[in-house]
């Protein structure tokens, strides 16, 4: 998948995030990125915190292992997850 690439020690996920949705869920690939809807609003970092929590739970890693690399204030984000391969991330996030 073009939205998940292996890097030293983990994977980088290219995401398109839609905050303030009715529920938090993965919608699928959209324009080369994985689209994720978040129930949290984009206020005071709530959506970013919800994204980190969602990814940590889905990938079965600690929240500290999920780091926002790019896109703190935008919808297009890059997230690094340590100790996870791209193949494992794809399997866990795309059902």
From Swiss-Prot:
PANTHER family: UPF0235 PROTEIN C15ORF40. InterPro entries: DUF167, YggU-like_sf. GO terms for cellular component: cytoplasm. This is UPF0235 protein Anae109_1126. It comes from Anaeromyxobacter sp. (strain Fw109-5). SMART domains: DUF167. Belongs to the UPF0235 family. Pfam families: DUF167 (PF02594).
């Amino acid at each position: 998948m073009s939205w998940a690439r292996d890097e030293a020690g983990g994977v980088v996920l290219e995401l398109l995030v839609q905050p303030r949705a009715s529920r938090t869920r993965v919608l699928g690939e959209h324009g080369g990125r994985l689209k994720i809807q978040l129930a949290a609003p984009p206020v005071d970092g709530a959506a970013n915190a919800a994204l980190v929590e969602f990814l940590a739970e889905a990938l079965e890693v600690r929240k500290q292992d999920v780091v926002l690399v790019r896109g703190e204030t935008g919808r297009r984000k890059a997230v690094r997850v340590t100790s996870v391969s791209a193949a494992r991330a794809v399997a866990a996030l795309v059902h």
